[in-house]
Amino acid sequence: MSKFVITCIAHGENLPKETIDQIAKEITESSAKDVSINGTKKLSARATDIFIEVAGSIVQKDLKNKLTNVIDSHNDVDVIVSVDNEYRQAKKLFVFDMDSTLIYQEVIELIAAYAGVEEQVHEITERAMNNELDFKESLRERVKLLQGLQVDTLYDEIKQKLEVTKGVPELCKFLHKKNCKLAVLSGGFIQFAGFIKDQLGLDFCKANLLEVDTDGKLTGKTLGPIVDGQCKSETLLQLCNDYNVPVEASCMVGDGGNDLPAMATAGFGIAWNAKPKVQKAAPCKLNTKSMTDILYILGYTDDEIYNRQ
């Protein structure tokens, strides 16, 4: 038997018992006699765990695919499949994308707006995030459009516009208390990823470096290896090694196609308000408003999250 937990998280203020019962029914019906329900646990008014056992041996990805109809049929509830083992809650490394994940914006689009090339950059970004364009090539195309931009005041102006996603500071604080290492791996730029790292008190950051000429202008190029999907995956493994963390105890959170390799490498992966293709390919999707909801996926209750015990 294989043990799993199905976490149901409502987008609204409440998760009705009728909805939980319906999802449990759909789980058993979609899996014939392979699945048995072993009980539920209320995490909050918005979230509930459904514990199941599956006959035989099956991995998370295959069970998620088997339950695709259940997952996709509830637009106002995220249905997340996790392995019910010690690593579900005992995460020791969380790796985050930056743009549209830790922060609401895409930094390169903010710079593009400053440079008057917003439309061109946005179109390339969309294609890259939907996995329709190689990330390295898309980055080169976008950065090239920024050539000649004076950076003396640009960096400070952009930093002032960055808005941290709701729930991120609280999530980071909670995870740090649980002795979890936190990192940001960004296909964006170190000039801003480093700033976000410092703002949130993260342990590590890696991103691309914009090249600046002797006149203080962007050259339209980056320096060093590009941080793409493969780089994120390899860096996640390196961080596991550096921090002595089992890969099973790691988690990747992101919204773009270039986050998928690291999600597949990590012990678990979360597509945060991601593009449809990314949601489908990722281990799970979370489309709520606050990133503290990730703690429900780990099995924490509101009492534990908000220290009400």
UniProtKB/Swiss-Prot annotation:
Its EC number is 3.1.3.3. It catalyses: O-phospho-L-serine + H2O = L-serine + phosphate; O-phospho-D-serine + H2O = D-serine + phosphate. The active site is at D97 (nucleophile), D99 (proton donor). GO terms for cellular component: cytoplasm; nucleus. Mg(2+) binds at D97, D99, D255. GO terms for biological process: L-serine biosynthetic process. SUPFAM superfamilies: HAD-like (SSF56784). Binds 1 Mg(2+) ion per subunit. Substrate binds at E106, R142, S186, G187, K232, N258. PANTHER family: PHOSPHOSERINE PHOSPHATASE (PTHR43344:SF2). Present with 13800 molecules/cell in log phase SD medium. This is Phosphoserine phosphatase. It comes from Saccharomyces cerevisiae (strain ATCC 204508 / S288c) (Baker's yeast).
